[in-house]
Amino acid sequence: MTLNVEVCWISNEKERGLKALKDFVPEEEIFIEDPIVSCQFLYNRQYFPGCSYCMKSLEEPENMLQRLSGCSEVPNLPFIYDYKEKYPQGDVYTNENGLEVYCSQECKDKAYKEFQNLLDVDGRDPEHPLLKLEELWKSFHYPPESATPILIARIIAIIRNKLDQGVSAEEAMAPFLSFKNDKKNQEIGIIQKFLDEKFETRIKEVHQLIVDALYDPRIPELFTMSTFQVLLCTICLNAQGIGTSNFENYSRFIRNLPDSSIKETALDYLDQFNDGIEEESGMFTHLEGSGLYALHKHINHSCEPNAQIRFPFNNNKVQVIALKPIKKGEEITISYIDLDDDCDCDECEEYEEFEEAGCSSSNANNEEEAREEEGEGEEIPGEDRRSYLREYYLFECHCSKCQREIEEYNKTHKKN
């Protein structure tokens, strides 16, 4: 596949970024990418059945809508049979203990080849380190969730399997240590911001359980506290929030119906469930997790982004879409935070609903909490926005919007 972007040096401040190799028009796909590793959040998987590998939402659309809206009966969704014919769920596969579910034999095979062969546990043994790890994590990291320790377990398992294939330790670890993560980012403080203050007192317990479950004497450096903190910071600062929903996929199918009158009637029918969903489920409407992406990781932030992240395939494959015209040679940028875009197209409305579910970025939940605490309105004031980026992403934003705001402030200040 020919790439439409290239990784290149942007500046000493930004370091590497992505530049367009062609012109793009609004709503044009720039690229799509599978994660190098991903995982569903722990509490979330108790309520949203999904593929343990690709995070495909496995709940039938009508059942999902009934549960999310609190309906007493299963809704009779229009064109549901046409949808299922186009997007068949297929057979579901599990591992021997039944704790992991896969949407296909292909996903199951990939999972076991990459990491699951080292992560299977006896579900009847509550003392297994990985099961204890899950319970410990859930004891202090409550919904809305922003991370999971199983992502680190999968990373370690992937590295160990690479060693078994004859790959050197340095080469096996390289993909996970190449994310932006300098010395100041490795401080425990940034981990606390993304997770919970209680985490500081539990970090040794979490680390020890991972060591107990997965230690490999061939790579002792992978199991030090220092490396553990680096991996945690990598996830906190670089992981992309993922959200999938079979009902959302069905809704997208309805919006793409060719007959406008039939489409509007179907959408009107679905609209009647909105209040029920808000009352019954609030922000918890998607299968949620996070993942690390090899190309996506190079996309820098702008408060006036020219691109946007979406998940339109009902799995963990990320899609990067142009929001405005992009010229060849121009840097591709996204917003790391919710900027309350005023675009009202169907796709952006759907994306905004997804953001409200706490899935748009690895720390979307922290952002919402911070805004509530500060009593902010719909639009983040310029200085508050920059302060948030400094605090949670450890950089000073100098995008065109920030520079404009600072210049306008300076002019006003001088006049006064």
Predicted regions and their residues:
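Amphipathic alpha-helical protein-protein interaction segments
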Residues: 10-13, 17, 23, 40, ...
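C-terminal SET catalytic tail plus cysteine-rich post-SET Zn-binding segment of SAM-dependent SET-domain
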Residues: 19, 36-171, 175, 303-416
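Residue-level marker of intrinsically disordered, low-complexity segments enriched
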Residues: 3-8, 34-35, 228, 233, ...
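N-terminal alpha-helical interaction blocks
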Residues: 1-38
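General secondary-structure edge motif
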Residues: 3-4, 87, 279, 379
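Pocket-edge structural micro-motifs
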Residues: 9-11, 32-34, 296, 300-303, ...
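Catalytic cores of histone-lysine modification enzymes
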Residues: 142, 146-310, 315, 349, ...
